[in-house]
Design a protein with these regions (language model features):
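Compositionally biased terminal segments of proteins
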Residues: 1-232
Length: 232
């Protein structure tokens, strides 16, 4: 039953993205991660736009297809200018779109990633789902920029995502410099290493992705450990 509801949510997100295809935005967050790693379920879809004019166009489409504008929850990941839209799929089940306007600002650290920076570090890629066979070609944030954003944010889900996609990083020196420009790199990498070194972390990965081979786990972990000593 739960899996059916999650599939329903994913199908709705893909339908929504197809409706928004002519809009000017970049996919970030969990759905962006799905372009670089084994797909996982994501509660909502996060997109970045440059200005209020684009927001008006996107909002018009979302309202037309059944979404309602909602007040962002207090525990929302983001801070600053962003709008949330939700569509009920069931009496207790909804899908949501978070639209970040002008920048992506992390609530905990107040680190800012300008929308222009996000667009400059994005490209057209294939978006894959976890439960549906459909694929979409969308503008998605590049892996190095996504890693920088998630390593600055450093929530539990961010660290898990970093672990899964870090072996595919393209320019580690650049990633480090982007983190350093917004936060204490030592603080962020220490937090990540502490988390991925715990037994609970591997168990948590298995809960999301199923069986995780020990050799692959160690390879991924070592990639991050070596990043800690890299010189930018």
């Amino acid at each position: 039953m739960i899996k059916d509801l999650l599939s329903l949510r994913e199908e709705e997100i893909f339908k929504t993205l197809k409706e928004l295809r002519d809009s000017d935005f970049v996919i970030i967050g969990g759905y962006a991660v799905n372009s670089y790693a084994l797909p996982r379920f994501s509660v909502d879809c996060d997109i970045t736009i440059k200005d209020e004019n684009e927001l008006r166009k996107i909002e018009k489409i979302l309202l037309k297809i059944g979404y309602k504008k909602e007040r962002p929850p207090k525990e929302a990941q983001y801070f600053g200018s962003f709008s949330r839209y939700e569509k009920k799929l069931d009496s207790n089940f909804a899908v949501s779109m978070d639209v970040l306007i002008g920048s992506v600002t992390d609530r905990m650290t107040r680190a800012v990633f300008a929308a222009d920076w996000v667009f400059e570090n994005s490209s057209m890629k294939i978006l894959k789902g976890k439960t549906i066979a459909e694929e979409l070609k969308m503008r998605i944030i590049n892996i190095d920029a996504l890693l920088a954003m998630k390593m600055v944010s450093c929530r539990a889900t961010d660290i898990r995502d970093v672990f899964m996609i870090f072996p595919k990083a393209q320019n580690k020196e650049w990633i480090k410099s982007e983190i350093q420009a917004r936060h204490d790199f030592r603080n962020r990498i220490s937090r990540i290493i502490e988390k991925i070194s715990s037994k609970q972390f591997k168990d948590g990965l298995s809960g999301v992705y199923g069986y995780f081979d020990q050799k692959i786990f160690e390879k991924y972990r070592n990639a991050i450990l070596s990043f800690a000593s890299i010189k930018s």
